[in-house]
C-alpha cells in the first residue's frame, strides 16, 4: 500500500462515501422497486424479480447471471469500468447464497459420487457461506453505491424464546453483513398498505445506519411512486 498516495481527508458528505446497503423484507414488499431508483444503477437480477419495476418510470440496466461464475465476471467488468455506473444492486443475496451452497454440493459430488446430490452437509453450508461473504466484499469495494437485497427470516432465541427478524442468509454471512455494510434497512407494509423503512434495531428487528441522522421509521406512504431509495438518500445527505 502506498500510504502517502492513499491517505485522504474525511469525505465532506454522504454521497462521496458511496455506502453499502443491505435491504431486506418479505416477498412482495417492494425491495426491487425501491432500490431501482438508485442513481444510474445496474440491477443484477439473480432471482427474476425485475418484472416489478416495469410499472415504474425508471430504467436501470439489467444483467441476469445464472451462477457464481457469471457474477464474478460482472464484478470484474464493473471493477474495470467503474465510471459506467453510480450504483449496483444484487437482487437477491439470498438467492446467491443458494447458488453458493449448490456449487459446493456439486463439487463434493464430483469428488465422491456416492454423496447425495440433494443433501447439503454442514461442510457445504460452510463453504457456501465463505463464497457469499467473498462475493459481497468484492462488490462492497467498488466505488459506487452497493445494494444487497435479501429476503427476511425469523430467528428464535432458544434461551429466551424471543423471535427476531433479519436478512435471510446464514449466520456467518449475516456476521459479515453486520461488519461491512453501512446501512441495514428493513421494509415492511402495515395493515393500511403503508410502506415503512425500519432504520434502527429494536427487540424484534435487525437494522442499523452508520451515516446520517434518520428517524427510527421512515413512512413512505401507500403509493409506489413515492416508494424510492433516492428519497431516502436525499434525507441522509441532508441530515
Question: Each PLM stretch: what is its role?
Answer:
Residues 146-219:
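Phosphate-binding/switch region of NTP-binding enzymes
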Residues 92-176:
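P-loop NTPase motor core
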Residues 2-99:
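Conserved P-loop
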Residues 38, 57, 141, 178-179:
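Short, well-ordered coil/turn elements that cap or connect secondary structure elements
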Residues 78, 136-139, 181:
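Hydrophobic, Leu/Ile/Phe/Ala-enriched alpha-helical segments that form helix-helix packing faces
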Residues 13, 33-35, 138-139, 174-178, ...:
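A general structural signal for short secondary-structure junctions and capping/turn motifs
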Residues 1-5, 15, 19, 192-239:
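C-terminal regions of RecA-like/P-loop NTPase motor modules
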